[in-house]
């Protein structure tokens, strides 16, 4: 199993989630987060000294999926969230060693 983690622009969250739902993704978790990376960070921090309210808001999506679905999910997220401009976000994939449903554990 894999964990797909995506940080995307909040403006594209509805389109990404809709496309994942249409593709049969059965569940995901979404978080409102703040942060930044890349070349903008140096300029940004020189003007705004590390105050959380000054960081741009993004959406963090997490999808646990079968290994064979990973590439499809990554591509769906990338297509729906891509503008071609800096700040579109990132997608990371991690291995998931074990998944258990809490209600089904003894």
List where the protein language model places each region:
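Positively charged, small/polar-rich N-terminal and surface patches that mediate targeting and assembly
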Residues: 1-106
